[in-house]
Amino acid sequence: MAARGECRRAGQDSEPEPEREPESEPGPEPEPQAGLESGEAFEIVDRSQLPSPGELRSASRPRVADSWSAPILTLARRATGNLSASCGSALRAAAGLGDGGGGGERAASKGQMMEERANLMHMMKLSIKVLLQSALSLGRSLDADYAPLQQFFVVMEHCLKHGLKVKKSFIGQNKSFFGPLELVEKLCPEASDIATSVRNLPELKTAVGRGRAWLYLALMQKKLADYLKVLIDNKQLLSEFYEPEALMMEEEGMVIVGLLVGLNVLDANLCLKGEDLDSQVGVIDFSLCLKDAQDLDSGREHERITDVLDQKNYVEELNRHLSCTVGDLQTKIDGLEKTNSKLQEELSAATDRICSLQKEQQQLREQNEVIRERSEKSVEITKQDTKVELETYKQTRQGLDEMYSDVWKQLKEEKKVRLELEKELELQIGMKTEMEIAMKLLEKDTHEKQDTLVALRQQLEEVKAINLQMFHKVQSAESSLQQKNEAIASFEGKTTQVMSSMKQMEERLQQAERARQAAEERSHKLQQELSGRGSALQLQLSQLRDQCSGLEKELKSEKEQRQALQRELQREKDTSCLLQTELQQVEGLKKELRELQDEKAELRKVCEEQEQALQEMGLHLSQSKLKMEDIKEVNKALKGHTWLKDDEATHCKQCEKDFSISRRKHHCRNCGHIFCNTCSSNELALPSYPKPVRVCDSCHTLLLQRCSSTAS
């Protein structure tokens, strides 16, 4: 197993190195696939030119005889062995092409593809490790002429060409890795800028040059790993360009994507020259695998020194940021003290204003009480006046009721008299036949009675008109005086009863006229019989005339009573007008009371707003004190944090799962401990970093709570 290589950088993610794999035992060399072109994945190198493992051991010093256990040399030995085996098998396959059957060729091609994938994986790990180590020692900004960077692009190009299908066209066969890279534009819209800029370069004439330019631009954007991950996730589209056993179609592709994430710490400034990109020949440099143990020891010491320097730089940056934060906090404290003094002055002014407003409020209350007492007195006086008027009105109404009862009794008596007269008329009709002269007199008397009846009818109509006028006047009095509605309603009911009784009397008079007509008809028949009874009838007629005169006198008295009632109604109207004026005065007093109440409510609102402002000022002061205490606690906590080394962590601190190739190490920028990707996937902006950085779950929740408390 190859030991895990380490690459550290203060303030950046730590990249795990692959564990050592068991060395492949030498077996039967697989035959190459028929039609395989030489130099498809690698250039063929003469095996005799490569140093053997024995020569390497003899070349090294005696004290480092066991140095092959080191990670770089072990990987170099495996890479040289695999490459030499693949080259030898390719030469033998070229010599004995066509000897094996179809099944043997497939098995040999699969074995060869597996060996090539393993070799490319080891070379990719070595190139990335050497690139990161050299970049961290010299500086993280790289140019296009940097040898480890060029070697990385060569290995990356071989990885993308591995297992690539050959496309036939009219011109000939075309085999370029720019075709799969064009798919990234469809899968990830962010890569459209790279594709368009590569197509618009006029100096690029070949597809290989465009593919290399695409890799340069993706590395400069620090999104090479993201784009390749999107491409590998869509293997159905990749199957159109790659064989099933290709490196991009197997698990090694995801491992390479994980290794490429570590290159995001580097800043590359690459120049895109079309001639250089089109004419470059991708040759893998195996001199990286031939470092001695002394360089390895010096590399370890250099790594330790860089770790110590990174820790020192981290602590210095922390102290610098803490000093900056302390200065900012001191300025904030000064500003808060100034604002506190201003707020205290405003508070004293507000208290003076409140005292003056309270005095004004007390004066307004006293004025309000005086006005209220006056209004209450005026209301009581008006109530007493209305009570007296109501009592007088009730008394007048009782008198009217008594008068109406007397009139009703008189009408009943008249009805009785009329009934008696009808009876007497019947008797007289029986006696009218005695004398014609008496009948003439009776006719004259009847004409006179008709005249009197007409006069009585006219008087009744006048009484009706008067009653209607009274009714309308009572309705107007009801609208002005609501308290007298019930009395007027009862009065109207009684008037309607009188009207109904008058109508009944008219109907009875009509019946009497009809009876009189019948009596006249009978009188014609009984003229002979009434001739002897004329004197008696004259006496009776005189009596009837006396009764009619008495009825006329009673009607005159009723008219006088009606006139008296009209006068009383006029007086009541005058009193109602006076009451309306008094009610208007009361309404004016009510409006003044409402205005005073509104002013009082506005003053209360002003007082409440000033009290709320004072409360808010107190809350702001308490919150500023709490913020100061929180900032002091944060400074204390930051001073106690230490940056944990990669060697000291073998498992995640939160989920306690062991780290591996797929589960990488990540530092929390707040507490300095190491976590896996799932436990430290959150990003927050810290005061010591200009951009959002990786933070563990516990620190994420704690920082969010602090932010929410400060925001509230």
From Swiss-Prot:
One of the GO biological process terms: regulation of endocytosis
GO molecular function terms noted in the UniProt entry: lipid binding; protein-macromolecule adaptor activity; SH2 domain binding; SH3 domain binding; zinc ion binding
Which residues does UniProt call coiled coil?
Answer: 325-378, 409-621
- Where does it localize? Early endosome membrane
Which stretches of sequence are listed as region Disordered? 1-45, 498-532
PROSITE patterns xrefs: RUN, ZF_FYVE
Which parts of the sequence belong to the RUN domain? 143-275
Q: Where are the zinc fingers (FYVE-type)?
A: 646-704
Give the sites modified to Phosphoserine.
Answer: 624
Q: Which Pfam families match?
A: FYVE, RUN
Q: Where is Zn(2+) 2 bound in this sequence?
A: 668, 671, 696, 699
- Which GO cellular component term is one of those annotated? cytosol
Main location as per UniProt: membrane
Subunit and partners:
Self-assembles through coiled coil domains to drive ELVA (endo-lysosomal vesicular assembly) formation. Interacts with BMX. May interact with SSB. Interacts with RAB4 and RAB5 that have been activated by GTP-binding. Interacts WITH RAB14 and RAB4B (GTP-bound form); the interactions allow endosomal tethering and fusion. Interacts with ARL8B (GTP-bound form); the interaction is required for RUFY1 endosomal location and promotes interaction with RAB14.
Chain's role: Activating adapter involved in cargo sorting from early/recycling endosomes. Regulates retrieval of proteins from endosomes to the trans-Golgi network through interaction with the dynein-dynactin complex. Dual effector of RAB4B and RAB14, mediates a cooperative interaction allowing endosomal tethering and fusion. Binds phospholipid vesicles containing phosphatidylinositol 3-phosphate and participates in early endosomal trafficking.
* Comment on protein domains: The FYVE-type zinc finger domain mediates interactions with phosphatidylinositol 3-phosphate in membranes of early endosomes and penetrates bilayers. The FYVE domain insertion into PtdIns(3)P-enriched membranes is substantially increased in acidic conditions. The 2 coiled coil domains mediate the interaction with the dynein-dynactin complex, the RUN domain is also involved in the interaction. The coiled coil domains also mediate self-association.
Protein name per Swiss-Prot or TrEMBL? RUN and FYVE domain-containing protein 1
Organism source for this protein?
A: Mus musculus
> What taxonomic classification does the UniProt entry list for its organism?
Eukaryota, Metazoa, Chordata, Craniata, Vertebrata
Q: What's the name of its gene?
A: Rufy1
